[in-house]
């Protein structure tokens, strides 16, 4: 018989004594699931001791095979989730490259925004940068082209000024549509003290000043007879206008770079849509 200590221990641990086949007591925990019944043929083969038969049954190949299949099925089902997670968490090479480029763009734009406010490292140059900003604004260019068209006496001058006016209107429309589609916010260090802004000017991609500077520079160099120093001055002006957008914190570097690219190809579109005096007269005649 078990000692009183064994009984007290079994009572505390939540076990119940059960007589075995050899006359000894076994303690079965109530917290565990009862073992599966032993096949009667196995009992007959191994003798009358149920403990020995139960141990032999647990080591039988059938039981091992069943447990292995259940583990493999569980493991196979669990492996699907990591594969799906890997598909979600592993972006493509293009996504990684784009994220890296944007991170470099934001870092470089913040480092170059040295005139973003008066307290910046180059804050004393900010008034000059704002003057360059006005020189590339759309309103002075539209007003200047319309005035030159009105004052021009020669048909050739009127043709050039008319197409310049058309190019400026086309630039404003294309940049406004693209800004409304992309909707990229301006840099966080930008101060909204810009000259004559509209609703789409709260977005930064692409830079309208950069597109206008690149397009107007190509237009002037191809349709005006300028001396070599003036041609260099036009190119220098277009470059400074684009660079000033980053110094003032108005745009990121990629906004200006794409703006130059877009303005360069906008000029090709203007050449395709060029309005000659003959085409203009025929259009006016059709309207009348």
From Swiss-Prot:
Function: Magnesium-independent polyisoprenoid diphosphatase that catalyzes the sequential dephosphorylation of presqualene, farnesyl, geranyl and geranylgeranyl diphosphates. May regulate the biosynthesis of cholesterol and related sterols by dephosphorylating presqualene and farnesyl diphosphate, two key intermediates in this biosynthetic pathway. May also play a role in protein prenylation by acting on farnesyl diphosphate and its derivative geranylgeranyl diphosphate, two precursors for the addition of isoprenoid anchors to membrane proteins.
A GO MF label: sphingosine-1-phosphate phosphatase activity
Membrane topology note: Multi-pass membrane protein
Subcellular location: Endoplasmic reticulum membrane; Nucleus envelope; Nucleus inner membrane
UniProt-annotated stretches for the region Phosphatase sequence motif II: 206-209
Biological-process GO terms, alphabetical: farnesyl diphosphate catabolic process; geranyl diphosphate metabolic process; geranylgeranyl diphosphate catabolic process; phospholipid dephosphorylation; protein prenylation
InterPro entries in UniProt: P_Acid_Pase_2/haloperoxi_sf, P_Acid_Pase_2/haloperoxidase
Cytoplasmic topological intervals: 1-127, 183-223, 277-288
Catalytic activity: presqualene diphosphate + H2O = presqualene phosphate + phosphate + H(+); presqualene phosphate + H2O = presqualene alcohol + phosphate; (2E,6E)-farnesyl diphosphate + H2O = (2E,6E)-farnesyl phosphate + phosphate + H(+); (2E,6E)-farnesyl phosphate + H2O = (2E,6E)-farnesol + phosphate
Pfam family, one: PAP2
Keyword field contains Lipid biosynthesis: no
Renumbered residue ranges of the record's region Disordered: 1-82
Lineage of the species this protein comes from: Eukaryota, Metazoa, Chordata, Craniata, Vertebrata
UniProt-annotated stretches for the region Phosphatase sequence motif I: 179-187
Lumenal side: 149-161, 245-255
Keyword S-adenosyl-L-methionine: no
Segments for region (Phosphatase sequence motif III): 244-255
Keyword set, alphabetical order: Endoplasmic reticulum, Hydrolase, Lipid metabolism, Membrane, Nucleus, Transmembrane, Transmembrane helix
Active site location: 209, 251
GO cellular component: endoplasmic reticulum membrane; membrane; nuclear inner membrane; nuclear membrane
Chain ranges passing through the membrane: 128-148, 162-182, 224-244, 256-276
Protein name (Swiss-Prot/TrEMBL): Polyisoprenoid diphosphate/phosphate phosphohydrolase PLPP6
Site feature (Stabilizes the active site histidine for nucleophilic attack) residues: 255
Protein family: Belongs to the PA-phosphatase related phosphoesterase family.
CDD domains with a match to the protein in the record: PAP2_containing_2_like
Species in which this protein is naturally found: Danio rerio (Zebrafish)
Entry EC number(s): 3.1.3.-, 3.6.1.-, 3.6.1.68
